[in-house]
Structures are given as C-alpha cells and as structure tokens.
Amino acid sequence: TPHYXRFTWT
C-alpha cells in the first residue's frame, strides 16, 4: 500500500 514518508510516496 502507498505510504507517505517525508516528501515522497514510497
């Protein structure tokens, strides 16, 4: 699943 980490999607 998509996950937001700091400034970008990982």
UniProtKB/Swiss-Prot annotation:
It comes from the Eukaryota. Keywords: Cell wall, Secreted. It is found in: Secreted, Cell wall. One of its GO terms (cellular component) is extracellular region. Its main location: secreted. This is 50 kDa cell wall protein.
